[in-house]
């Protein structure tokens, strides 16, 4: 099991760290969503546009009740969509996330978890049952490139993807297309074949690399290695989409 930071328990409920939240439509799960960003991440993705979420103790420490006092204002809207938990990496705060998911299901809300899957072994059966959709970010198909790109191993993510398939949990696959890093046609084809094989990938989102997070790296004094990398061309994006479609997947 992967070691995680300590989360303080308050009675039968968890207390954890919330970085921020926002509303969205369509990209973070079906319908109108409240997107809750949990603090903390063990990956160090070179293209991360939210490095300010890496610190486990950034944001605001809150109880489940305090979080829900904020969420309840959005519930009428969320009936037409749901709530998505992201980060950072939400599974860093696994017990806190589990309590948040349970509270959401008690209010009959659709739930989604946006995760890189590296900590998927922290998802027990009860938590799995409270997740309606997983937005699975697979950063790269080649294990060596994955390690260079994220600082972590690829295999735990693939194991989690297989578990999700066994549990018949729907997945939206997310893939950031970075010229020179994740745009190798062989890697894209390998991931497409894997996604088709597991059989539970409902949608594939090809996300073009951008430089919108560059200023955050500078503010945090971090070494940003992609200063001179340009976004992929429309042709590169279309090519990646067509590769996934060639395996019978719904890609956009």
Question: Where is each model-derived feature located?
Answer:
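Canonical Radical SAM [4Fe-4S] cluster-binding loop centered on the CxxxCxxC motif
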Residues: 13, 20-62
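Short, conserved loop/turn and helix-capping segments at secondary-structure boundaries
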Residues: 61, 151-154, 231-234
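Conserved AdoMet/S-adenosylmethionine-binding subsite of the radical SAM
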Residues: 68-82, 87, 91-219
């Amino acid at each position: 099991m992967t070691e995680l930071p300590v989360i303080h328990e308050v009675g039968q409920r968890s207390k954890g760290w919330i970085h921020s939240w926002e509303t969205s439509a369509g990209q973070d799960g079906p319908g109108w969503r409240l997107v809750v960003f949990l603090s903390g991440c063990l990956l160090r993705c070179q293209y991360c546009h939210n490095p300010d979420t890496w610190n486990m103790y950034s944001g605001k420490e809150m109880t489940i009740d305090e979080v829900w006092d904020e969420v309840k204002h959005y519930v009428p809207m969320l009936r037409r969509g749901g709530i998505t938990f992201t980060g950072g990496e939400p599974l860093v705060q696994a017990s806190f996330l589990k309590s948040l998911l349970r509270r959401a299901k008690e209010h009959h809300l659709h739930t989604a978890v946006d995760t890189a899957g590296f900590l998927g072994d922290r998802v027990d059966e009860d938590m799995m049952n409270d997740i309606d959709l997983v937005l699975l970010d697979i950063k790269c198909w080649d294990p060596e490139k994955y390690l260079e790109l994220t600082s972590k191993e690829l295999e735990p993510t693939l194991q989690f993807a297989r578990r999700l398939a066994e549990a018949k949990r729907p997945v939206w696959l997310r893939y950031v297309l970075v010229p020179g890093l994740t745009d190798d046609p062989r890697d894209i084809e390998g991931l497409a074949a894997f996604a088709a094989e597991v059989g539970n990938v409902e949608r594939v989102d090809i996300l073009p690399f951008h430089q919108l997070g560059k200023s955050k790296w500078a503010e945090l004094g971090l070494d940003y290695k992609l200063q001179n990398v340009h976004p992929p061309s429309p042709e590169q994006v279309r090519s990646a989409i067509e590769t996934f479609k060639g395996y019978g997947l719904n890609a956009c």
